[in-house]
Swiss-Prot record:
Any one Gene Ontology BP term: translation
Keyword Disulfide bond carried by entry: no
Any one annotated GO CC term: small ribosomal subunit
Keyword Transcription regulation: no
Full protein name: Small ribosomal subunit protein uS19
Family annotation (InterPro entries): Ribosomal_uS19, Ribosomal_uS19_bac-type, Ribosomal_uS19_SF
Gene: rpsS
NCBIfam families for this protein: rpsS_bact (TIGR01050)
Source organism superkingdom: Bacteria
Keywords: Ribonucleoprotein, Ribosomal protein, RNA-binding, rRNA-binding
Organism: Citrifermentans bemidjiense (strain ATCC BAA-1014 / DSM 16622 / JCM 12645 / Bem)
Function, in words: Protein S19 forms a complex with S13 that binds strongly to the 16S ribosomal RNA.
Length: 93
């Protein structure tokens, strides 16, 4: 179920405050654990380091990302491929 329109997008307060401070000053990377925060238009052009459970993934925010969640751009799982079939390997030799 989608979030109610009257509530507006969810953004952690500390993240919004850091973004406003960065707008005026330097182009430093903003480190965050808040994967649940929605990307708002004020974040365009900023770089966030979003935590994926193990390390921080740098995410540069563009116009196309507005309305999505921070966590969508920081994958938490690594896919190494499906396990090879041992029977088919034996037949090839």
């Amino acid at each position: 179920m989608a979030r109610s329109i009257k509530k507006g997008p969810f953004v952690d307060g500390h993240l919004e405050a850091k973004a406003q401070a960065e707008q005026a000053g330097s182009k430093k990377v903003i480190k965050t654990w808040s994967r649940r925060s929605t990307i708002i238009p004020e974040f365009i052009g900023l770089t966030f380091a979003v935590h994926n459970g193990k390390k921080f993934i740098p995410v540069f925010v563009t116009e196309n990302m507005v309305g999505h969640k921070m966590g969508e751009f920081s994958p938490t799982r690594t896919f190494y491929g499906h396990a090879a079939d041992k029977k088919s390997k034996l037949k090839k030799k």
